[in-house]
């Protein structure tokens, strides 16, 4: 799979570069509020057929495609589709064969913003972990591929630092201590 971004409709924005003796403006593309944003496509190239298909993520074109993951059998691609305001996420499943939309597994909404930073982690062919701050803390949620929330994995108010993996029905991760000065290693079933 590959990601293609078109910024041709985005306004140029100057950033002052003062790293050299004489400063100069570096021009970047920056989508100012109320102006056009970049547009993205996600494509899948099939080496056997030498053909490319594009994932049908739908409208609007000004959206963010993030946390892209392959399914365990390589038949599906999962994408967190985030609106431009970054306050509404749809976690969608698409066909890797023809690019068609299959279903929305779940949605996350916030009055402030949704910040999807971590891709899904499959722990079996039909269950996966999703990491989210939807309860105000960085937490793990166990879902099945039908989109059903099986459970919130952590009952305590953890601020997860790193996810290390899954083995023998256990999730391994580290989180900051309550005072924020230390890090604890955890194993949760």
Spell out what each predicted region is.
Residues 46-50, 96-99, 144-148, 189:
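Short loop/turn segments that connect beta-strands within beta-propeller blades
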Residues 6, 48, 83, 134, ...:
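A broadly conserved detector of short glycine/acidic/proline-rich loop/turn motifs that flank catalytic sites
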Residues 1-3, 27-34, 38-41, 56-82, ...:
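Conserved beta-propeller blade repeats
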Residues 1-8, 169-189:
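Repeat-solenoid scaffold signature
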Residues 9-15, 39-41, 86-93, 136-141, ...:
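Structural motif
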Residues 2-54:
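Predominantly five- to eight-bladed beta-propeller fold
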């Amino acid at each position: 799979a590959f990601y293609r971004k078109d910024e041709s409709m985005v306004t140029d924005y100057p950033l002052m570069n003062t790293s050299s003796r004489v400063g100069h403006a570096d021009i970047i593309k920056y989508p100012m509020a109320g102006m056009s944003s970049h547009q993205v496509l996600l494509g899948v190239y099939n080496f056997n057929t030498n053909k490319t298909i594009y994932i049908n993520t739908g409208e609007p074109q000004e959206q963010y495609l993030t946390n892209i993951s392959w399914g365990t059998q390589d038949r599906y691609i999962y994408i967190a589709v985030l609106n431009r305001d970054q306050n509404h996420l749809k976690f969608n499943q698409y066909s890797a064969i023809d690019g068609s939309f299959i279903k929305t597994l779940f949605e996350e909404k916030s009055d402030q913003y949704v910040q999807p930073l971590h891709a899904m982690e499959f722990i079996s062919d039909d269950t996966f972990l999703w990491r989210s701050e939807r309860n105000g803390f960085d937490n793990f949620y166990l879902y099945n591929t039908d989109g059903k929330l099986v459970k919130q994995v952590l009952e305590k108010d953890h601020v997860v630092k790193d996810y290390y993996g899954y083995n023998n029905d256990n999730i391994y991760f580290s989180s900051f201590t309550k005072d924020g000065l230390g890090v604890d290693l955890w194993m949760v079933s």
